[in-house]
Swiss-Prot record:
Keywords assigned by UniProt, alphabetized: Acetylation, Isopeptide bond, mRNA processing, mRNA splicing, Nucleus, Phosphoprotein, Repeat, RNA-binding, Ubl conjugation
Any one cellular-component term (Gene Ontology): nucleoplasm
Glycyl lysine isopeptide (Lys-Gly) (interchain with G-Cter in SUMO2) crosslink, residue number(s): K5
Post-translational modification: Phosphorylation regulates its ability to bind RNA.
A Pfam family hit: G-patch_2
Known partners and oligomeric status: Component of the minor spliceosome, which splices U12-type introns. Interacts with PRKX. Interacts with DHX16. Interacts with PRKACB.
Descriptive protein name: G-patch domain and KOW motifs-containing protein
Organism: Homo sapiens (Human)
Length: 476
């Protein structure tokens, strides 16, 4: 009992010493970017500007010259194999059987290894990188199971390193091509490639590109002048193809007429022009327009108006003179005796008169630029009916019928294609229909074959005209 009591400590004898806690390990502060570590991003290198030459900036550090990209050609690895010996009668069938069995065993072992690897790598991404072996190369080693050579396995290509436009030249350089040298074994000469240029917008396949380029103004542009001179010469300089700008038509049915641009059609490269004579809006290709100054526009439009006024006044005077002549002739006929009617009629028949050439089914050109404000100027049309020797009715290609057209408003039209039918309108063969054989633009003459007379005649352009009538018509 005494021993047990001695081993038990009393509760009241507790120690009054203070209790303290401490840590023996401290956590180090982690830095996100370590400047001493080589794996971190390198600081940006500063460059300084050295000189400025034109639009080029030269720095202190010279730039490396761009290297020419070369894609080496993959050589074919065809190797010569010794010819197989023909099987002789001494061939051991047992050796052949052993070879077949050993090959089957190797295939089974390879298949088992493959399945084992697939099971082990079940959790791995199934997308594998399959190396491409050079075409025509056989794996090195004794058997077919040996690994391919390292040089036959291509490296992973960096497609961003080679631009698309430089890929073809890089392949040619790898094949041994050099700039300035010909390609070929027998006729190695440099052949310039044919580059097809795009046609100007708005010109189709039937348009003549050379004529459009010839009409386009190619003069040198003027240097800008001071503000005072620009304001002074503002009317002397063309504004260009802009709405409100003055232009002149260079080609087409409205050739030589002036007008102002009302609007532009950039999709079809055409402009809506209001003609100065007649105030009619027409659509013309921009290639057939030339901008003019306001001073030139005012001068030419004034001349056209004066010509129009003089033409109308001449027409009025001509009508008055014709009326006076008719009145005088009627008065003379009343006062002359009846016995003079016979000789007078004979003298009228013997008097020379101008020969008229109007005939039905002739294709003519309208040349009067004052008729209805020049609306039908340089337009091709067909004579529908002849009202009098010098008056006719015509129909345009659009189907419009024009009545009361005089002979002096029209001119004969010679076809361009050889073999087209023409009619002789002046001379002893008037009214004959033949075929055009050839034309001579320098002399304005043409060779015409007349089938009925079976002869070939040379006539002037004014003596023939394109005929659009029935093929079996050949009036005498």
């Amino acid at each position: 009992m005494a021993d047990s009591k001695e081993g038990v400590l009393p509760l009241t004898a507790a120690s009054t010493a203070p209790i303290s806690f401490g840590f023996t390990r401290t956590s180090a502060r982690r830095r996100l970017a370590d400047s001493g570590d080589g794996a971190g991003p390198s600081p940006e290198e500063k460059d300084f500007l050295k000189t400025v030459e034109g639009r080029e900036l030269q720095s202190v550090k010279p730039q490396e010259a761009p290297k020419e990209l070369v894609i080496p050609l993959i050589q074919n690895g065809h190797r010569r194999q010794p010819p197989a010996r023909p099987p002789g009668p001494s061939t051991d069938t047992g050796a052949l059987a052993d070879g077949v069995v050993s090959q089957a065993v190797k295939e089974l072992i390879a298949e088992s290894k493959k399945s084992l690897e697939e099971r082990e790598n079940a959790g791995v991404d199934p997308t594998l990188a399959i190396p491409m072996i050079q075409k025509g190369c056989t794996p090195s080693g004794e058997g077919a199971d040996s690994e391919p050579r390292a040089e036959t396995v291509p490296e992973e290509a960096n497609y961003e390193a080679v631009p698309v436009e430089a890929y073809g030249l890089a392949m040619l350089r790898g094949m041994g091509w050099k700039p300035g040298e010909g390609i070929g074994r027998t006729f190695n000469q440099v052949v310039k490639p044919r580059v097809n240029s795009l046609r100007p917008k708005g010109l189709g396949l039937g348009a003549n590109l050379t004529e459009a380029q010839a009409l386009t103004p190619t003069g040198p542009s003027r240097m800008p002048r001071p503000d005072e001179e620009q304001e002074k010469d503002k009317e002397d300089q063309p504004q260009g193809l802009v709405p409100g700008g003055a232009v002149v038509v260079l080609s087409g049915p409205h050739r030589g007429l002036y007008g102002k641009v009302e609007g532009l059609d950039p999709d079809n490269v055409r402009a809506m022009v209001r003609l100065a004579v007649g105030s009619r809006v027409v659509t013309v290709s921009e290639y057939y327009l030339r901008p003019v100054s306001q001073q030139e526009f005012d001068k030419n439009t004034l001349d056209l108006r004066q010509q129009n006024g003089t033409a109308s006044s001449r027409k009025t005077l001509w009508n008055q003179e014709l009326y006076i002549q008719q009145d005088n002739s009627e008065r003379k006929r009343k006062h002359l005796p009846d016995r003079q009617d016979g000789p007078a009629a004979k003298s009228e028949k013997a008097a020379p008169r101008s020969q008229h050439w109007l005939h039905r089914d002739l294709r003519v050109r309208f040349v009067d630029n004052m008729y209805k404000g020049g609306q039908y100027y340089n337009t091709k049309m067909i004579i529908e009916d002849v009202l009098s020797p010098d008056t006719c009715v015509c129909r345009t290609d659009e189907g419009r019928v024009l009545e009361g057209l005089r002979e002096d408003m029209l001119e004969t039209l010679v076809p361009k294609a050889e073999g087209d039918r023409v009619m002789v309108v002046l001379g002893p063969q008037t009214g004959r229909v033949g075929h055009l054989l050839s034309r001579d633009r320098a002399r304005s003459r043409a060779l015409v074959q007349l089938p009925r007379e079976n002869q070939v005649v040379e006539l002037h352009y004014d003596a023939i005209c394109q005929y659009m009538g029935p093929s079996d018509t050949d009036d005498d």
